[in-house]
Amino acid sequence: MSLSLSLAEARRLALAAQGFDGRRTRRSVQRRHLREMLARLGLLQIDSVNALVRSHYLPLFSRLGPYSMTLLDEAAWSVGRHRQLFEYWGHEASLLPLEHYPLMRWRMHQAADGQGIYQQLARFGREQQPLIRQVLQAVREQGALGAGSLSTRQERAGPWWDWSAEKHALEWLFAAGELTVAGRRGFERLYDLPERVFPAELLARPELSEAQAQRELLRMAASALGVATEKDLRDYYRLSPAQSRARLAELVEAGELLPVRVEGWSQPAYCPGEPQVPRRLGASALLSPFDSLVWERARAERLFDFRYRLEIYTPKEKRVYGYYVLPFLYNGRLVGRVDLRAERARERLAVHALHAEANGMDDAALHELAEQLRSMAAWLGLATVAIEGRGELAVRLRGVLL
């Protein structure tokens, strides 16, 4: 029997899988709440842009409400029992649960062979092994080090992007799994040997074959997405089309993923078992541009009729919506875009622009947006919300916030 879903059902299924089916406002968010949500999502994308807050903090706020960012810092970079995560290339630079470390070993082996990494870094790995071994020895002898501690470069210009040769060596060793990220100093990575960072039991686990690991990554992607096309599934952990299609066929044949038709989708989709679609889902949140609900832009357009592009690197005069625009999820639909900035020197959360989608934003949506903005400002330690944008919608929001 062929399964089919309406577009509205697919949206609710996707939102529930992504953690938008729970109670957002708790009296206190505890470590276990973060651990449970991270297990559902599978990973958090890391990005250096700090216009609002580092992107890896936002997805948990969107789903759980205000929480102590120290909890995530401890989970990601502490020493001891509170450490639950590690950094690696999942969906771009990512934080992943420690138990998923064995699932990435095949990718580390490929990186060591110059596969699946930037061409310039692969070339560096082929040409600069003596320097790479020197850098590894320095870390072995001195402990966790950042690129700044090793750099001998006197000038900014050089043949390897704008990185020092030592930074390239560290990045190559990280990609190859010979080093890992022990912590961060500010936003600078501190690299150390995996055996000095991770439990011995974790490193001693048997390695999976590439096929086994890729099947598990696709299973986890399907669980995190709820319903997804082959391209959606492979994008979650950045598998190649060849890797994804072969493993997907095996999972379907084994009955672990079920094909499903979604209204309006031209490509077949897949679910991890018989879909359990929530009858109603009224989730509302401001979303990071790097949130796993929207990071695959074609999927966001298919699910929500929401065409979304990040305009950070677009010249100001050519931007349509703004520099750092967060989609606004209201009652399970993406209804608006908010260009936000944390202006810490002025202790305010500034709305530089506000745009509604074609169906507009009614008073109830604006009141919910105002609550989201107040909550975010308090979470970031900012005293006020300031509406800098112009237009009728901004005027209405300003009135709601008064």
Identify the role of each PLM range.
Residues 1-402:
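Long, charged, low-complexity, helical-prone intrinsically disordered regions
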